[in-house]
Regions:
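Conserved phosphate-binding loops in N-terminal lobes of ATP-dependent enzymes
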Residues: 1-38, 109-150, 154
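Catalytic, metal-anchored helix/loop core of enzyme active sites in primary metabolism
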Residues: 1-6, 16-25, 48, 58-60, ...
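Fe-S-dependent hydro-lyases/dehydratases of central metabolism
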Residues: 18, 25, 41, 46-65, ...
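Flexible, acidic active-site loops/lids enriched in D/E/S/T/G that coordinate Mg2+ and/or position polar
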Residues: 33-116
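Short coil/turn connectors at secondary-structure junctions
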Residues: 47-51, 81-87, 95, 103-108, ...
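Fold-independent oxyanion-binding glycine-rich loops
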Residues: 57-58, 70, 87, 91-94, ...
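An extended, acidic
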Residues: 143-295, 299-304
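Extended hydrophobic packing segments that form well-structured cores
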Residues: 293-329
């Protein structure tokens, strides 16, 4: 499945990124998200698969397309032949809608896919999260004090706590964790949006980020877990259940224990995981979409678990004219 579909999913995220990038800086995050969703949905139906959206833009009554449970792929076209692989898909057509709307860095189009049952059907709630790279797997505990986790990370990385950089979403709810990190002596990189990109950075040696801590969306947590499976990183996460309607949503999705701490393999247990993302705006991991007179250039990341491949793909999309020139600079 991975070999067959990885480049197909590359097309999906590229088209979503290109559509979103055309709205960059317009100040309308809803429109940016809308065009990314439309582009992703359109290309998704050209992929040779029997796909089901398990994490998307919301419930059926909340989203016109890419809603949870929606069927996508060539298998659902009229008179389609049998035999397409069954695939569960998690999507975020534009992670960082505000980033795109303001032209800020690190907006991406992203999806993860797996065989049936390979991705947790997470409700659209918040999750407490801690994300670390391969060297720190097993060293952190979601219930441990921040200082203890930072000491454990520093020990695994053979450095001082003062050498560490922790990424945290810049939100009022994170005031305590920010103070705890500072009190421990570690440095902080606050980000306005894009905790998925931050999680990937924490798992890549040389990115200058050693951990991500705080509370973010549960759908992004599952997407991050898919990336961690491919990068040998770790995410620990727990749903934030604070209202009766949250309990109802968990029950509807078959989740019985709202206090459970999920490890990476529980959020993304699949054996054939594909993770694909494409830069929309310039970022620390991926370049943004670049438009020029005769085409478009995109920069993407495609990872496959079973094949153990991490590919950075630089694509030039040329205009369909006979006199078009290819440029590499």
């Amino acid at each position: 499945m991975e070999i067959q579909l990885s480049l197909e999913f590359l097309r999906v995220v590229e088209e979503a990124a290109i559509a979103a990038a055309r709205t960059m800086g317009y100040g309308d995050r809803h429109h940016a998200d809308h065009v990314a969703v439309e582009a992703m949905r359109r290309v998704m139906d050209t992929v040779p698969m029997d796909g089901t959206i398990v994490i998307g833009e919301g419930e059926r009554d909340e989203a016109p397309m890419l809603f949870i449970g929606e069927k996508v792929g060539l298998a659902h076209k009229e008179k389609a032949p049998d035999g397409f692989p069954a695939v569960d898909i998690a999507v975020d057509p534009l992670e960082g809608t505000n980033l795109c709307a303001t032209g800020a860095p690190n907006a991406i189009a992203v999806l993860a896919a797996s065989e049936k049952g390979g991705l947790l059907h997470a409700p659209d709630l918040y999750m407490e999260k801690i994300i670390v790279g391969p060297s720190c797997k097993g060293a952190v505990d979601l219930d441990a004090p921040v200082q203890d986790n930072l000491r454990a990370i520093a020990k695994r990385l053979d450095r001082d706590v003062e050498d560490l950089v922790v990424m945290v979403l810049d939100r009022p709810r994170h005031e305590k964790i920010i103070n705890d990190i500072r009190k421990a002596g570690a440095r902080i990189r606050l980000i306005g949006d894009g905790d998925l990109s931050a999680g990937i950075s924490a798992a890549v040696v040389g990115a200058g980020v050693h951990a991500v801590m705080g509370t973010g969306g549960a759908p992004e947590g599952v997407l991050t877990a898919a990336a961690m499976r491919c990068l040998n990183g770790q995410i620990l996460a727990r749903l934030v259940v604070s209202k009766p309607e949250h309990e109802e949503r968990l029950a509807k999705m078959g989740i019985k224990d709202g206090k459970r701490i999920y490890d990476t393999e529980e959020l993304a247990p699949g054996r054939n995981i594909i993770f694909a993302c494409c830069g929309v705006t310039e970022g620390s991991l991926l370049r943004g979409v670049r438009f020029f007179g005769e085409g478009i250039r995109t920069h993407s990341l495609v990872m496959t678990l079973d094949q153990r491949q991490v590919r950075f793909i630089d694509t030039v999309h040329l205009e369909k004219r006979p006199d078009v020139k290819v440029r590499f600079a």
